[in-house]
Amino acid sequence: ALEPRFATEPGLVVISPATPGSNGITRAFRERAGRHYVDTGIAEEHAVAFASGIARAGGRPVLATSATFFQRTFDQLQQELSLNGTPVTLLDFGGGLSGADNTHSGAFDIAMFGNIPGLTCLAPTSGRAFLDMLAWSTSQSNTSPVVIRVPGDTILNRERSGDLPGDAQDVTDMGSADDTCSNACSEKTTADGTATCPWSRYRTIRRGTTV
């Protein structure tokens, strides 16, 4: 999704704090990306500050790492991203109850990111939604920091299978997508009152703004 834009967007930079392999950043991609890819080493705090500097200079940086490692960057998320409002995109891998050990548990990502003022938090429920969100967050129309909770294999495998939830009798929605979900389901409601909203998503946004 990002690679085709490198030729025309010199400020589009992918950053990894020494976790490229576990975040889908292959060796082949890194070689093709050239200066559009930077590995900061095991220095997540520096990676966030570095990304904020790129964004402040007009670039569109994308920082990818595991949810558990973002915990080390809380100070930089507050001081570098929140206070400056820089349009950095954070790709949050392994969020929620994931991983097979305590070290790589991403259970605290929403609690942490949700307490960073001005940080837009998105959780796509499909691969397509993820790519759409990534395209928006790295575009010039976005002017603030964004974190995207990258969907895992369970979601992606279900999407590939085409097994969508249906035959719903009730619609449950929560958060700022409330009205949008309700309106969409209302328009699709059948004569017997059945409605389905299969691709609902969680997000937190700044008061008074819409995405």
Task: Label the model's feature ranges.
Residues T154, D163, T196-P198:
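Acidic/proline-rich low-complexity IDRs
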Residues M174, D178-V211:
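N-terminal low-complexity segments that are often proline-rich with Ser/Thr-Pro
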Residues L156-A177:
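Condensing-enzyme catalytic core mediating Claisen C-C bond formation in acyl metabolism
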Residues A1-V147, T154, P165-A168:
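Thiamine diphosphate
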Residues P4, T8, A64, V88, ...:
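Hydrophobic transmembrane signal anchors and adjacent membrane-proximal interface regions, especially
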Residues D75, G152, D163, T204-T210:
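Sequence-pattern detector for short linear motifs
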